[in-house]
């Protein structure tokens, strides 16, 4: 994992595969800042028209193949968008948890959303 930035906390390296800076509130209350790594995970997306909603069409968004997630490495957790994490379906790929606003006005998330079955 040469020259990929991440944050180390609790025995894991968190690599942010989104273009956004992340503040994650850990279980002990610590706020861990995870900067963008410079890599970006993407997920193929298509839309299917479902129904009319007033004067607009309502679409179902469908997700397909994931791109840009490195191979698994011991102790490394990759943080991606929810759709990319769900499509990847790997234990080492997560997405930001519930969004909150900190007392100082910064946005953060509470932990991570997981998308594997284990």
Predicted regions located by residue number:
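Intrinsically disordered, low-complexity segments enriched in small/polar residues
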Residues: 1-13, 19-118
């Amino acid at each position: 994992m040469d020259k990929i930035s991440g944050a180390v906390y609790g025995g894991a390296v968190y690599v942010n595969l989104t273009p956004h800076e992340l503040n994650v509130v850990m279980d002990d209350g610590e706020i861990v800042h995870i900067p963008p790594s410079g890599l970006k995970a993407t997920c193929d997306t298509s839309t299917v028209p479902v129904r009319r909603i007033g004067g607009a069409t309502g679409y179902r968004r469908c997700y397909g193949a994931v791109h840009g997630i490195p191979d698994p490495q011991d102790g490394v957790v990759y943080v991606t968008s929810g759709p990319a994490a769900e499509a990847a379906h790997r234990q080492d790929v997560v997405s930001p948890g519930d969004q909150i606003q900190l007392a100082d006005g910064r946005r953060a998330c509470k932990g991570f959303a997981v998308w594997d079955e284990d």
